Amino acid sequence: MSSSFKNAGQRKNHRERAQPFERRKWGLLEKRKDYAQRAQDYKTKQKKLKRLREKALERNPDEFYHEMTHKKTKNGVPLEQREDSTIDMDTIKILKTQDIGWIRHHRNVERAKIDHLEQQMHTVGAHRNKNESRKHTIFVDNVKEAKSFNPAEFFQTTDDLVGRTENRVKKDQIENNELTNQPFSGKLHSKLKEKAATELLLRQKRDKKLAAAEERVELDRLLQGKGGRQKKKVVNGKPVYKWRNERKR
């Protein structure tokens, strides 16, 4: 019973010794746990350096690696072949002012327009293939109708325009002065195809910039999050990180 009263009573607070006033310029007084952590970190680094020295001594300079065929060295130091990783000012502004949702939305819009332009280019190119033989087959009931068949009358156009395979103008349109000044030529097709190709190239470049911006923002978001990570290597001038596996609960 007496021990219970003894434990219930207030006890003296044991505080750790602080840094003396005359030594305050040296910062906080180091405790044993601080020294142990610093010593453990020092020993870990020394072990890594020892392993690296052993690997350097055991390395055979005449040994062949397949990476030697596409790698370069300068004074024995490997050089990384960097791609054009520069980002223009517009992309930097996007990184600073917009979030990844805005980038993904506009990238989806660009992809849809790229697909539409690719289909449009295939359609325009298919219309003007001069080497392709194009035929329009008309079926009749008997031989007599086949002999008396008039293509101009069947297509309701003139004899001059009946040979066209597309954009065939009808007589009522000619009488109403419609489409008479709109000849469908190969130059028009080439201009349309050239315009579509130029726009497609510009949109592909913009999609590539948006993809780089999305990758940069996603990497920054992951680096700011929780979890242990380690920088493993650099590929094409870009760092590659590896995160520690965590148990899902």
Swiss-Prot record:
Q: Which Pfam families match?
A: Utp11
Q: Where in the cell is it found?
A: Nucleus, Nucleolus
GO terms (molecular function) for this protein are: snoRNA binding
Recorded hits in PANTHER family, A to Z, give: U3 SMALL NUCLEOLAR RNA-ASSOCIATED PROTEIN 11, U3 SMALL NUCLEOLAR RNA-ASSOCIATED PROTEIN 11-RELATED
| Annotated family | Belongs to the UTP11 family.
| Assembly | Component of the ribosomal small subunit (SSU) processome.
- Functional note: Involved in nucleolar processing of pre-18S ribosomal RNA.
The protein's name in its UniProt record: Probable U3 small nucleolar RNA-associated protein 11
The record lists the organism as: Schizosaccharomyces pombe (strain 972 / ATCC 24843)
From the broadest rank down, the organism's phylogenetic lineage runs: Eukaryota, Fungi, Dikarya, Ascomycota, Taphrinomycotina
